[in-house]
């Protein structure tokens, strides 16, 4: 959503192509004008508040008339929700279509990664059963990196990068209760993420997260939402599964992992709640988690502190640095934002466990 700007005066003329406007040092297009009014939109990030106008003469022979308003206005940016890319047809259907932002579509996008490691800033997305696709924010193009068939996946699921961004790990919901099939695949940036290799074999799972302090990949399996990690086996010269702890005591359930950017702890989302597992720097291992926000099995939309708050289906989340925490000298400077999937909203959780709704409105 953009903010309208109307400028009133005299002798503006009736040709908007001859009127040039900058707001806060950023150029905006003159949408319309008459002799007494100019209509345009506030451009993005125009926070300085100074407005400059340049009007060319009707015949183009005289020097432009330039004017800068003495009075500055204070523009307060409002958070809004919009569509970056993708659309549906008249019946509300869509499918995976590559192309520019105007024509690209998504069939079943579920997981999202911000790729800040490459030369160009991109988003990496996939949905259950793929494909993995790249959204290039600079060229404004969408391309397919790998389909499920190309990677021999049973059911593509969660993704994460390693600490360098050179390796992309992908969970595979292959549906088996044995360790005969690949659970985590890895894709390399050097190959443009177009070849999937086996990283570790295990039972079916849904999520993975990388611990930067120990350079270890953690992931979940279905049974009790158990957290496993991949460790090197000198006998096989490969990675094998090692159980760390179960998330749930008495249920088999999906669990999704997000490791703190500094490796201090790990959030585990699922079953209507958020668990927190602290990292022990002496043992170099995550500890058995405790309930941090929401309540296991209690589905609702309630903004409230800690376990008195409620989630419908807490799904993928990400840590976001809060500059106010940094200025205040707090030990943890990150808020946690997650998608409350069936609640149709984005929730925010502070380091103290305060739950609020950031965008959308919860529906149960």
Describe the residue ranges of each PLM region.
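Residue-level detector of Asp-centered blade-edge/turn motifs that repeat once per structural unit
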Residues: 114-120, 161-165, 210-214, 259-263, ...
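Gly/Pro-rich loop segments of beta-rich domains
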Residues: 74-108, 140-157, 174-175, 191-204, ...
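Hydrophobic/aromatic beta-strand positions that recur at structurally equivalent sites within the blades
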Residues: 76, 135, 185-190, 210, ...
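Residue position within the beta-strands of beta-propeller blades
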Residues: 123-126, 169-171, 218-220, 267-269, ...
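Residue-level signature of beta-propeller blades and closely related beta-rich strand-turn architectures
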Residues: 128-129, 173-174, 223, 270-272, ...
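Ser/Thr/Pro-rich low-complexity tracts
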Residues: 1-82, 191-192
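A short loop-to-beta-strand structural motif that recurs across blades of beta-propeller domains
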Residues: 130-134, 180-186, 225-229, 272-275, ...
């Amino acid at each position: 959503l953009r903010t309208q700007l109307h400028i009133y005066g005299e002798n503006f003329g009736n040709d908007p192509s001859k009127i040039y406007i900058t707001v806060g040092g950023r150029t905006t297009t003159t949408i319309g004008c008459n002799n007494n009014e100019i209509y345009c939109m506030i451009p993005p990030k125009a926070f300085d508040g100074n407005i400059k106008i340049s009007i060319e003469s009707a015949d183009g022979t005289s020097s432009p008339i330039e004017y800068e308003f003495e009075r500055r206005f204070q523009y307060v940016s409002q958070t809004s929700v919009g569509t970056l890319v993708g659309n549906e047809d008249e019946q509300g259907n869509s499918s995976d279509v590559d192309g520019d932002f105007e024509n690209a579509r998504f069939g079943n996008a579920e997981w999202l990664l911000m790729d800040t490691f490459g030369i160009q800033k991109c988003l990496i997305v996939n949905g259950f059963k793929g494909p993995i696709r790249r959204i290039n924010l600079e060229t404004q193009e969408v391309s397919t990196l790998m389909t499920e068939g190309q990677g021999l996946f049973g059911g593509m699921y969660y993704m994460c990068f390693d600490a360098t961004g050179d390796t992309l790990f992908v969970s595979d919901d292959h549906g088996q209760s044995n360790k005969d099939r690949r659970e985590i695949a890895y894709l390399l940036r050097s190959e443009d993420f177009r070849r999937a290799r086996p990283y570790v074999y295990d039972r079916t799972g849904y999520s993975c997260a990388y611990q930067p302090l120990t350079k270890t990949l953690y992931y979940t399996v279905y049974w009790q939402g158990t957290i496993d990690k991949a460790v090197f086996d000198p006998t096989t010269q490969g990675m094998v599964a090692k159980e760390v702890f179960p998330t749930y005591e008495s249920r088999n359930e999906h669990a999704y992992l997000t490791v703190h950017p500094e490796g201090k702890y790990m959030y585990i989302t699922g079953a209507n709640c958020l668990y927190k597992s602290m990292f022990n720097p002496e043992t170099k291992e995550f500890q058995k988690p405790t309930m941090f926000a929401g309540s296991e099995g209690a589905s609702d939309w309630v903004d409230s502190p800690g376990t008195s708050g409620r989630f419908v289906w807490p799904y993928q989340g990400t840590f976001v640095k809060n500059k106010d925490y940094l200025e205040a000298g707090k030990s943890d400077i990150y808020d946690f934002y997650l998608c409350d999937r069936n609640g149709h909203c984005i929730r925010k959780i502070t380091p103290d466990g305060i739950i609020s709704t950031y965008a959308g409105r919860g529906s149960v």
